[in-house]
C-alpha cells in the first residue's frame, strides 16, 4: 500500500481532479474511487488518509456513507476531508467526521454539475469555468501543503441541520428525477454512459442507450456524453453541459489510480 491514500467520489471529474492534484503534491498516493464500493477498505498501513467528495443534496453522495463505515484507518494516521460544492458545502463533512474523525478539513467551490437543478454559474462568488478551475488547482496545492505539515483544523465541521434535512429527502427527489431521463436520436450507442454508470443502470439496446430507475444523480452519463444525447427535462437541453477538462471518462471507471 502507498504511504498516502485518498478516497474519492467524483461524478463529473472535479473531485477526482482535485484528488489527483493533491496526490501529485504528496507523492506515493493511491486514489481509491468510491463511485462503487471501494476496492480497498483496510488502509491501516497508510500514514495519511484523505477523503474528497462533492456536496449532493446537502450531504454525502449516495452510497458513500455506507462505504465510509467499512473503511479501517490506522490509529496514528493523519486524516483529512475535502468537500467540493457549488453554492454551499452542506453537512457531508460533518457526517464524515462523525464516522472517521478528521484532523483537517476544508471546502472548495467549483462548477455546479447538477444542471437540472441549477446552472453552472451558481457558484459563490460567480466565476467562469476557467477561473473556477484555476482556483481549485491553487486550493488543492494549498491543501496538500497543509497535509504535509499535518495541519489541524481548529474546530469540527459544522452540523448544518437544514442541510441534514435536505439530505434526508434527497433520495426521494433523485428517484423522481430518474424517471425523467431521455435519450435523443443523437445517441450513437457508443456505450460510454453504460460504462460510466456506477449502478449499472444503463444498457445499450436497439442501437441506443436505455436508462433505468436506479440512479444516484452522479450525472456522469449526461455530462460525458460525446453527443449530448442525454437529458433530464428540457432545461438540461438549454444549459451548457460540463465535465472537468482534466479527467477522462475512462479514469472515472477505474477502481484505484496510483500517483508516484
Would you name each region that the model predicts?
Residues 38:
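Membrane/wall-proximal cationic-aromatic binding patches
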Residues 10-13, 87, 188, 216:
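A generic structural signal for alpha-helix starts
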Residues 4-8, 183:
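Local sequence-structure signature of Cys/Sec-based thiol-disulfide redox active-site neighborhoods
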Residues 2-5, 13-18, 24-35, 43-53, ...:
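FMN-binding flavodoxin-like domain, especially the glycine-rich phosphate-binding loop
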Residues 182-183, 188-216, 220-237:
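Iron-sulfur cluster-binding cysteine motifs and their immediate structural context
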Residues 160-198:
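A mid-sequence, solvent-exposed acidic-amphipathic segment
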Amino acid at each position: 500500500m502507498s504511504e498516502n491514500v485518498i478516497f474519492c467520489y467524483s461524478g463529473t471529474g472535479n473531485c477526482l481532479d482535485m484528488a489527483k492534484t493533491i496526490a501529485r503534491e504528496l507523492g506515493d498516493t493511491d486514489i481509491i474511487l468510491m463511485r462503487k464500493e471501494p476496492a480497498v477498505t483496510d488502509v491501516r498501513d497508510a500514514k495519511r488518509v484523505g477523503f474528497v467528495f462533492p456536496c449532493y443534496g446537502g450531504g454525502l453522495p449516495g452510497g458513500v456513507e455506507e462505504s465510509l463505515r467499512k473503511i479501517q484507518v490506522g490509529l496514528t494516521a493523519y486524516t483529512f476531508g475535502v468537500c467540493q460544492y457549488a453554492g454551499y458545502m452542506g453537512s457531508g463533512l460533518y457526517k464524515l467526521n462523525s464516522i472517521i474523525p478528521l484532523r483537517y478539513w476544508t471546502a472548495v467551490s467549483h462548477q455546479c454539475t447538477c444542471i437540472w437543478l441549477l446552472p453552472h454559474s451558481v457558484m459563490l462568488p460567480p466565476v467562469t469555468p476557467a477561473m473556477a478551475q484555476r482556483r481549485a488547482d491553487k486550493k488543492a496545492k494549498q491543501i496538500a501543503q497543509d497535509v504535509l505539515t499535518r495541519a489541524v483544523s481548529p474546530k469540527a465541521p459544522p452540523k448544518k441541520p437544514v442541510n441534514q434535512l435536505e439530505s434526508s429527502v434527497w433520495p426521494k427527489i433523485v428517484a423522481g428525477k430518474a424517471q425523467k431521463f431521455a435519450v435523443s436520436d443523437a445517441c450513437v450507442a457508443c456505450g460510454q454512459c453504460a460504462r460510466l454508470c456506477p449502478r449499472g443502470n444503463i444498457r445499450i439496446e436497439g442501437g441506443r442507450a436505455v436508462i433505468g430507475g436506479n440512479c444516484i444523480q452522479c450525472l456522469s452519463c449526461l455530462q460525458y456524453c460525446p453527443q449530448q444525447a442525454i437529458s433530464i427535462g428540457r432545461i438540461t437541453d438549454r444549459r451548457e453541459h460540463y465535465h472537468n477538462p482534466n479527467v477522462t471518462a475512462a479514469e472515472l471507471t477505474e477502481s484505484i489510480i496510483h500517483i508516484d
